[in-house]
């Protein structure tokens, strides 16, 4: 089964701008992509990166600079059989977490993000199409039902945490020791406990 990994190689992770400059954000984004590809390499499935420009990585790359939704939908339409989509910013993902996505025998399997988005999915219904936006999980449930697919939702912390904002980096530093965590450490990003909850800061 082919697994598409969308990746913004042009101007990634702009919500980290208060903490990281453009080159640093690019380095973190590429580290996350490689963490995701490392996890996928331990599954039986073949990843393909859908990138806005060419990127050096361990998987084949298809360059498509269109917005996320049309790029993914055209990729899904070109596949004869089941296909999955796993976002490139799931820095906490593990082979076991991916196994929970790939295992259910359902028409559509969805892994929602913490804010209501869709962080990963598996589609066995050829007519299923995506529509990515803030609350896309809810709409993807409806879209799967509309094409006659039974839907399974995967409740997984490691699939639910995607890295967009500085607070998300807390989870990376707490729960992983992969390429992303190493890159953050090299940039001087570290945990900064507060009275209410953890945060991150940069060493001066």
Language-model regions, residue ranges each:
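N-terminal nucleotide-binding beta1-loop-alpha1 segment
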Residues: 1-16
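Short, hydrophobic beta-strand segments that form beta-sheet elements in well-ordered domains
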Residues: 46-52
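A short, N-terminal amphipathic alpha-helix
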Residues: 29-46
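Conserved alpha/beta core of the MobA/IspD/sugar-nucleotide pyrophosphorylase nucleotidyltransferase superfamily
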Residues: 147-204
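Short phosphate-binding loop-to-helix
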Residues: 58-84
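The conserved acidic donor/metal-binding loop of glycosyltransferases
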Residues: 87-91
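Short, glycine-/small-residue-rich phosphate/pyrophosphate-handling segment
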Residues: 122-146, 204
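Conserved donor-nucleotide/metal-binding helix-loop-beta segment in metal-dependent transferases, i.e.
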Residues: 93-117
